[in-house]
């Protein structure tokens, strides 16, 4: 069972201690289509829960990636900047967008687990 938590905007976060890894869901990458550009935040940037933290562009649309929790960015994934198509191949794995140190770990509890997210996706069909 995945320890990922999801937002209604289709971001995911996986938390290890006080560090979270953030990306977009497989549903989101599928909806976007072929990803052609990614912008990730710089380390040291402070982001608030729900605030724009990254950008993903596809042949169909440009979309913001929002931070699911508040914290300080510790790393951006240069691999997806160099090869945006990785987002389509491994959205919920190697194609994470950024890592951050959580400033309020309690915010994670407000997010959906995999089962709740799957149920939410069914309401969008």
Swiss-Prot record:
Query: Matching InterPro entries, A to Z?
Result: 2-oxoA_DH_lipoyl-BS (IPR003016), Biotin_lipoyl (IPR000089), GCV_H (IPR002930), GCV_H/Fam206 (IPR033753), GCV_H_sub (IPR017453), Single_hybrid_motif (IPR011053)
Q: Which GO biological process categories is it annotated with?
A: glycine decarboxylation via glycine cleavage system
**Organism superkingdom:** Bacteria
Q: Which organism is it from?
A: Paramagnetospirillum magneticum (strain ATCC 700264 / AMB-1) (Magnetospirillum magneticum)
Keyword Cytoplasm in annotation: no
Record-given protein name: Glycine cleavage system H protein
Q: Could you describe the subunit structure of this protein?
A: The glycine cleavage system is composed of four proteins: P, T, L and H.
Q: Which cofactor does it need?
A: (R)-lipoate
Role played: The glycine cleavage system catalyzes the degradation of glycine. The H protein shuttles the methylamine group of glycine from the P protein to the T protein.
Q: Where are the transmembrane segments?
A: none
Q: Which GO terms describe its cellular component?
A: cytoplasm; glycine cleavage complex
The record's comment on cofactor binding reads: Binds 1 lipoyl cofactor covalently.
Query: Which UniProt keywords are listed?
Result: Lipoyl
Residues annotated with N6-lipoyllysine modification: 60
- Report the sequence similarity comment from the record: Belongs to the GcvH family.
Q: Domain Lipoyl-binding: where?
A: 19-101
UniProt-listed Pfam families: GCV_H (PF01597)
The record's gene field reads: gcvH
């Amino acid at each position: 069972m995945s320890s990922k938590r999801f937002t209604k905007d289709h971001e995911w976060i996986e938390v290890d201690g006080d560090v979270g890894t953030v990306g977009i869901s497989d549903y989101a990458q599928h909806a976007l289509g072929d990803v052609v550009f990614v912008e990730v935040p710089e380390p040291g940037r402070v982001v608030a829960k729900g605030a724009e933290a990254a950008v993903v562009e596809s042949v169909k649309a440009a979309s913001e990636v929002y931070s699911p929790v508040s914290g300080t960015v510790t790393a951006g994934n240069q691999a997806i900047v160099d090869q945006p198509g990785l987002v389509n191949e491994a959205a919920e794995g190697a194609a994470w967008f950024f890592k951050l140190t959580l400033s309020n770990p309690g915010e994670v509890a407000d997010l959906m687990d995999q089962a709740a997210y799957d149920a939410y996706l069914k309401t969008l069909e």
